[in-house]
Amino acid sequence: MGIKTYKPKTSSLRYKTTLSFDDLSKGNDPLKSLTKGKKFKSGRDSSGRISIRRRGGGHKRKYRLIDFNRRDKFSIPARVASIEYDPNRSANIALLVYKDGEKRYIISPKDIKVGDVLESGPNAPIKIGNALPLENIPIGRTVHNIELNVGKGGQLVRSAGGYAMILASDGNYVTVKLSSGEVRLIFKKCIATIGEIGNEDYVNVSIGKAGKSRWLGRRPKVRGVAMNPVDHPHGGGEGKTSGGRHPVSPWGQPTKGYKTRKKKRYSDKFIIKRRNK
């Protein structure tokens, strides 16, 4: 998928870039049976208070139901019917039509095409788009949509252009290197999909103007030093100030390098090397 640029007919178009969408199937609306309504909460919790700042507005979306598991379709071949855009994630999605007639969406791997036949299960061939237990995937292969708990469905490596690499297999665990640089152990019966995720140019897209952020449901981010003392620890003062202290969050938590991870987490024993800072 290439990057599309615009002639600067207006100042807002000068730095704006978008994806070309040439690789997507033409004229395909999302399958109605695999979509549902999505109500935006505008960052509010159940009591109506803001729990996540800078959310609100944006274009309406239908949520596409994605199959992150693929366990109940072991050894049933599926044909790729279309590759579609999904407004709810950075990756594209692929519509699979199984031999038994059922249709499902999955995250679209890189280099798959309409008409390809995919499969899942321990005996599936080593091929891009096929889902297998980690113990059945050769060392050195790239994978995505990795399970952390057997049967829960893929939780790791699900965004555009993402991939992880199988480094080793020993006993009940497989060593996997994630794109963040973290190296961790994952139970060998957990399922992963072979290959990288497509739409790798997503990271190079420039929003270009404030209005597009609003289309995506993102509201402005106001600096703490521009607020009043009642709103932020950096607020107040006569004229422009530096904030007068080390950077903190609105609730006084030190930021910019302060470690917030719990010192004793159950998952520490599975992490061989922490992610790159």
From Swiss-Prot:
Source organism of this protein record: Borreliella afzelii (strain PKo) (Borrelia afzelii)
Gene name linked to the record: rplB
Keywords, alphabetical: Ribonucleoprotein, Ribosomal protein, RNA-binding, rRNA-binding
Similarity comment: Belongs to the universal ribosomal protein uL2 family.
BP term (GO), one: cytoplasmic translation
Location of region: Disordered: 32-58, 225-277
PROSITE patterns: RIBOSOMAL_L2
Function as written in the Swiss-Prot or TrEMBL entry: One of the primary rRNA binding proteins. Required for association of the 30S and 50S subunits to form the 70S ribosome, for tRNA binding and peptide bond formation. It has been suggested to have peptidyltransferase activity; this is somewhat controversial. Makes several contacts with the 16S rRNA in the 70S ribosome.
GO cellular component: large ribosomal subunit
Name by which UniProt lists this protein: Large ribosomal subunit protein uL2
GO molecular-function term, one example from the UniProt record: transferase activity
Comp. bias (Basic residues): 258-277
Pfam families: Ribosomal_L2, Ribosomal_L2_C
Subunit structure: Part of the 50S ribosomal subunit. Forms a bridge to the 30S subunit in the 70S ribosome.
InterPro entries: NA-bd_OB-fold (IPR012340), Rib_uL2_dom2 (IPR014722), Ribosomal_uL2 (IPR002171), Ribosomal_uL2_bac/org-type (IPR005880), Ribosomal_uL2_C (IPR022669), Ribosomal_uL2_CS (IPR022671), Ribosomal_uL2_dom3 (IPR014726), Ribosomal_uL2_RNA-bd_dom (IPR022666)
